[in-house]
Amino acid sequence: MLTWLSRTDFDFPPLDKALQEPNGLLAAGGDLNPQRLVAAYRHGCFPWYQDGQPILWWSPDPRTVLFPDELHVSRSLAKCLRQQRFEVTFNRDFRAVIQACAAPRNYADGTWITTPMQLAYQELHLRGIAHSVEVWQERQLVGGLYGLAMGRLFFGESMFSRADNASKVGFVTLVRHLRDAGFVLIDCQMPTRHLHSLGARAISRGEFADYLQRYRDQPPTGDLDF
């Protein structure tokens, strides 16, 4: 049975209560209060819903993650990085990145990054929890991604690209930065061909929960200069 959250109840059900179909649906309702969002990621779930739906909270099994030491950079991508076609920055324009991620795409109907979602994550950014990666070409924003840093874990949310390899360059730059700071895992949530090409793989929900428990409160071991 699906758990419905009230606006005053920040407690999520155990992850093993998530539905098998649709895979990982854990709870519905509540709101996008910053404290609730932080509680959700600490618990192992995330919001994903369309306009007109209640807020839906998910914890899929398996979970797609990337371990920084397993990052795969193809020859063509390595060449692109060496050529320095792009400038990559952190937290220069979070709002522009999340708006670009929310923009309609040719292969999808609508967007799950609703206006309330954008405002909620912008608030997390102001609190130093959510971060953006910007990829620039000739002073134009051509790619980027955003997510949350918590302990030695990074929770990726969405990325976009307006130029070939732009989002991949941003992602690789972020992963290398996180690796140097001692991060152990990047949550990619759901599988995509794009992420698998970069080294992401699936682990069980239980294994993901173990990483959460162990690393969500550990400070980075290196300089996390966002």
Curated annotation (Swiss-Prot):
This is Leucyl/phenylalanyl-tRNA--protein transferase. Keywords: Acyltransferase, Cytoplasm, Transferase. InterPro entries: Acyl_CoA_acyltransferase (IPR016181), Leu/Phe-tRNA_Trfase (IPR004616), Leu/Phe-tRNA_Trfase_C (IPR042203), Leu/Phe-tRNA_Trfase_N (IPR042221). It is found in: Cytoplasm. Belongs to the L/F-transferase family. HAMAP family: Leu_Phe_trans. GO terms for cellular component: cytoplasm. It catalyses: N-terminal L-lysyl-[protein] + L-leucyl-tRNA(Leu) = N-terminal L-leucyl-L-lysyl-[protein] + tRNA(Leu) + H(+); N-terminal L-arginyl-[protein] + L-leucyl-tRNA(Leu) = N-terminal L-leucyl-L-arginyl-[protein] + tRNA(Leu) + H(+); L-phenylalanyl-tRNA(Phe) + an N-terminal L-alpha-aminoacyl-[protein] = an N-terminal L-phenylalanyl-L-alpha-aminoacyl-[protein] + tRNA(Phe). Its EC number is 2.3.2.6. SUPFAM superfamilies: Acyl-CoA N-acyltransferases (Nat). The keyword Lipid biosynthesis does not apply. It comes from the Bacteria. It is an enzyme of class 2 (transferase). Transmembrane segments: none annotated. Its main location: cytoplasm. Functions in the N-end rule pathway of protein degradation where it conjugates Leu, Phe and, less efficiently, Met from aminoacyl-tRNAs to the N-termini of proteins containing an N-terminal arginine or lysine. It holds the Pfam family Leu_Phe_trans. The gene is aat. GO terms for biological process: protein catabolic process. One of its GO terms (molecular function) is leucyl-tRNA--protein transferase activity.
